[in-house]
Swiss-Prot record:
Source organism: Paracoccus pantotrophus (Thiosphaera pantotropha)
Record carries keyword Transmembrane: yes
GO cellular component terms, A-Z: plasma membrane
Residues in compartment: Cytoplasmic: 1-18
Source species taxonomy: Bacteria, Pseudomonadati, Pseudomonadota, Alphaproteobacteria, Rhodobacterales
The protein, known as: Protein NapE
Periplasmic side: 44-59
Pfam families: NapE
């Protein structure tokens, strides 16, 4: 009897864990990752312009 009660709780507990994992990914990880990627690209462009000069025709 006790084993069957634990088995019925597992799907609810597993679903709750999946919802928590989704919220952590959606609210914390993806925003941080997207800001890091865009910031990294901006830094790369900025450093390349410092080294090679601004874009445009050579005068």
């Amino acid at each position: 009897m006790i084993d069957s009660a634990k088995e019925t709780d597992r799907p609810k507990h597993r679903k709750r864990d999946e919802v928590i994992a989704f919220l952590i990914l959606a609210v914390v990880i993806w925003p941080i990752l997207s800001v890091a990627i865009v910031g990294g690209y901006g830094f790369l462009v900025w450093m390349s312009q410092i080294i090679f000069g601004p874009p445009g025709p050579m005068h």
